Regions:
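Conserved mixed alpha/beta catalytic, RNA-binding, or beta-rich assembly cores of soluble enzyme
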Residues: 1-55
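C-terminal binding/interaction regions
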Residues: 41-127
């Protein structure tokens, strides 16, 4: 089965892909939110207003931390967390070169990742 992830106002594509894959593996409905926007928005505020990031979208590491927090009170988020070991050995492909943080998360989850040799943005240099 092919699972996709795309950029939204809240999440980067890698983060969305991981959440969508966990939903599929856990039999969780696509429409179900695993992380409420009310949890994501303060993280975005922290990133942009206090830590100086320009991109408010959560990377995969930040989404996994948020998911683990939600899992304490939400059974569906807890079910999704239990699917993490099942990602090992799966294949993922990105049509752009991913940020190092997302590449690192895929590596730690033991997901086999390939990327097209195209940058996601024209901002090739970071402050």
């Amino acid at each position: 089965r092919i699972v996709t992830g795309k950029t939204t106002n809240l999440l980067g594509p890698s983060a969305a892909l991981i959440l969508n894959a966990l939903k599929v593996l856990g039999g969780i409905e696509k429409k179900d939110q695993l992380i409420s926007p009310t949890v994501i928005e303060p993280i975005q505020t922290l990133k942009c207003d206090y830590l100086g990031n320009r991109n408010p979208r959560l990377h995969s590491d930040e989404v996994l931390v948020a998911l683990s927090i939600c899992a304490a009170t939400d059974p569906k988020a807890a079910l999704a967390m239990r699917q993490l070991p099942l990602l090992e050995g799966l294949e993922a492909h990105s049509t752009v070169i991913l940020p190092q943080v997302d590449e690192g998360i895929f590596r730690r989850l033991k997901v086999n990742l390939t990327c097209d040799p195209k940058y996601q943005s024209h901002n090739l240099y970071h402050k």
